[in-house]
A protein has these predicted regions:
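Sec-dependent signal peptide recognition
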Residues: 2-7
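C-terminal motif of bacterial Sec signal peptides marking the signal peptidase cleavage site
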Residues: 12-14
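Bacterial signal peptide processing site
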Residues: 16-18
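Extracellular/mature segments of secreted proteins
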Residues: 23, 77-79, 100-103, 124-125, ...
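Tryptophan-anchored aromatic micro-motifs
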Residues: 31-69, 129-131, 151, 162-175
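Short, hydrophobic/aromatic-rich segments at coil-to-beta transitions
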Residues: 51-59, 77-80, 101-109
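N-terminal glycine/threonine-rich, aromatic-flanked beta-hairpin/loop signature
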Residues: 66-101
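Contiguous, well-ordered beta-strand patches that form the walls/edges
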Residues: 87-137
Length: 176
């Protein structure tokens, strides 16, 4: 029985993913990639999201309205952004600020108010906000609107398209 337990523990340990390696600068900044995904990236079958700029327009149209996020290049390798999420006639969220990449994350720092910061998932094709956001972000929304869990699929990857994006009131989403 002891041999069976020992063999079972050894097999379970072999099934665990390798821990993220640390370099002299700290933890690895990108998500671990499986061997199959790495092979697909190296063969060119799929793009490496770590090398895809977030500049462009991300938008999802749905029955209640449209959710839009534009990302523009800014100084020092940073970005600026504007977003609007619409949940029907009244509830909506709108804000703008600066953004920066951190591995597979896009850190959105909103201007004004209570200093809302959202760490979004970015995979090259989509920006997905987390299911829970800081209470400081409530000021960005009217009515019962919330940015929790909102996702924005990419529709364009150029700054010109992002600059032309408008909110539902016709104002520029990414302020020049």
């Amino acid at each position: 029985m002891k041999r069976f337990a020992l063999a079972s523990m050894a097999m379970l340990a072999a099934c665990q993913p390798p821990s993220a390696s640390k370099d002299a600068g700290g933890e690895s900044s990108s998500a671990p990639v499986s061997g199959l995904e790495r092979a697909a990236i190296e063969s060119g079958a799929i793009p490496d999201s770590a090398h895809i700029s977030p500049v462009g327009l991300f938008r999802r149209n749905h029955e209640a309205g449209s959710d839009s996020l534009c990302v523009m290049p800014d100084a020092d390798g940073q970005f600026r952004f504007g977003l609007e999420a619409v949940f029907g006639e009244e509830p909506n969220c709108r804000g703008h600020g600066s953004a920066r990449r951190a591995g597979d994350k896009l850190i959105l720092s909103f201007k004004g108010g209570d200093r809302c910061i959202i760490v979004a998932q970015y995979d090259g094709d989509q920006v997905a906000l987390p299911g829970v956001v800081d209470m400081a972000c409530a000021d960005l929304c009217e009515g019962r609107g919330s940015l929790e869990g909102v996702s924005f699929p990419r529709i364009a990857n150029d700054a010109a398209t992002a600059l032309r994006a408008r909110d539902r009131g016709g104002k520029a989403l990414c302020e020049g």
